[in-house]
């Protein structure tokens, strides 16, 4: 089963009440949704919530890096999760938020066919 299509969607979720840290107030969760579709139309979903002050990633950086990762993963075996990780790690250091969204989506595909 090969990866046929990958889509990324920015999703901003307003919080009912902003939370405040020493770094300032946060009024919304700025997430990225990843949808991976295999060549048999099995779909896996993943999501990440990057937070600049914790991991150095933002919704915008995740979208940019995610597009590069998506291009590289097209045609890859959707069930070879370790191989997908190795490919992403060879492409770019760190960026674990967006990589985790891809990981979750690949695991979701595996769960869908189990």
Feature roles, as predicted:
Residues 1-55:
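Structured beta-strand/loop patches that form or line metal/cofactor-binding pockets in enzymes
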């Amino acid at each position: 089963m090969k990866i046929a299509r990958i889509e990324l969607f920015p999703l901003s979720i307003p919080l009912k009440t902003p939370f405040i840290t020493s770094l300032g107030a946060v009024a919304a969760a700025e997430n990225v949704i990843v949808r991976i579709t295999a060549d048999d139309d099995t779909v896996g979903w993943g999501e990440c919530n990057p937070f600049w002050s914790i991991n150095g990633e933002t919704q915008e950086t995740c979208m940019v890096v995610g597009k590069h990762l998506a291009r590289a993963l097209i045609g890859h075996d959707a069930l070879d999760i370790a191989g997908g990780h190795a490919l992403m790690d060879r492409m770019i250091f760190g960026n674990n938020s967006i990589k985790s969204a891809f990981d979750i989506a690949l695991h979701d595909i595996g769960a869908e066919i189990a």
